[in-house]
Regions:
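Short beta-strand-to-loop acidic/aromatic patch adjacent to the donor-nucleotide binding site
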Residues: 95-107
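Conserved nucleotide-sugar donor-binding
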Residues: 153-168
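N-proximal low-complexity "stem/linker" segments adjacent to membrane-targeting elements
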Residues: 1-30
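Conserved donor NDP-sugar-binding/catalytic core segment of glycosyltransferases
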Residues: 107-143
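Acidic donor-binding segment of Leloir-type glycosyltransferases
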Residues: 26-72
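Cell-envelope/extracellular polymer assembly enzymes that use nucleotide-activated donors
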Residues: 6-9, 37, 179
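Active-site nucleotide-sugar/metal-binding loop of Leloir-type enzymes
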Residues: 81-98
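Catalytic donor/gating beta->alpha subdomain of glycosyltransferases that bind UDP-sugars
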Residues: 170-238
Length: 244
């Protein structure tokens, strides 16, 4: 790919996201730089997620939909990756320079993807990137989903394709996003989440709260950190940091 190639694709993974999916689609359709293709994977939703996705595909030629059977419950970790790959394998184009795995409950600023690609163009070693993610907390206020600057938000995983191909994609297990970033750094790539105001993302549902409850999600996060071999003191410090 030429360094000036700004083509990118988006894979949205969505299960029971009828409340937020239309807003996510609208924020992508309003981007200053549109994706060459977007696949929405309806992961066995029991609400109107599938119908919303189908309507978007009828309206926009660059969107199409994959419907998966209902497995009976939301499957986190490896299930998210399986859903992503159902969309990735359904891509009609293979000619793109960047790719993004996106949750179905986000609002992106209009210059988001163009801004992230500019960051990539400015730093050829930057393999994965995102803006910072914020949760609404009422009365127009937001609270940041804290991650260190060297990590990329799992809700909006944007990759340079050359990096993605080298790391071999996502593993089908919990902490798939963190493992991908660690592998990227092992190969000499950089990963980063940027604090630029025009790259701020609104995540309408707190990360980890979509399956059962927030406590269960935080316990799952801790198990994932342990799985990756993080020191218990690091896990404790990181957990305390997320409380504030």
């Amino acid at each position: 790919m030429e360094s000036s190639d700004r083509s990118y694709v988006v894979i949205i993974t969505a299960r029971d996201e009828a409340r937020y999916l239309q807003g996510t689609i609208d924020s992508i359709a309003g981007q200053t730089l549109l994706p060459v293709e977007m696949v929405i994977v309806n992961d066995g939703s029991r609400d109107e997620t599938g119908a919303i996705a189908d309507a978007a595909a009828e309206k926009h030629a660059w969107i199409h939909v994959v419907h998966r059977d209902d497995r009976g419950e939301r499957k986190v970790g490896g299930g998210v990756v399986e859903t992503f790959y159902a969309g990735y394998e359904a891509l009609r184009t293979r000619d793109f320079a960047y790719q993004c795995k996106l949750d179905g409950d986000l609002t992106l600023p209009p210059g988001y993807f163009e801004g992230i690609i500019r960051k990539m163009e400015a730093d050829p070693a930057l393999g994965g990137a995102s803006g910072k993610v914020f949760n609404p907390v009422g009365d127009g206020a937001v609270k940041e989903e804290r991650i260190i600057d060297d990590m990329v938000s799992g809700a909006v995983n944007f990759w340079r394709r050359a990096c993605w191909d080298q790391i071999g994609g996502y593993v089908r297990m919990v902490m798939w996003d963190g493992i991908a970033m660690h592998r990227a750094r092992m190969f000499g790539w950089r990963t980063r989440s940027f604090r630029d105001k025009d790259l701020e993302i609104i995540h309408h549902r707190l990360m980890g709260s979509s399956h059962k409850n927030i406590l269960h999600g935080r316990m799952r996060w801790g198990r994932g950190q342990w799985f990756m071999g993080c020191h218990p003191l690091y896990i404790l410090a990181s957990g305390v940091n997320r409380m504030f």
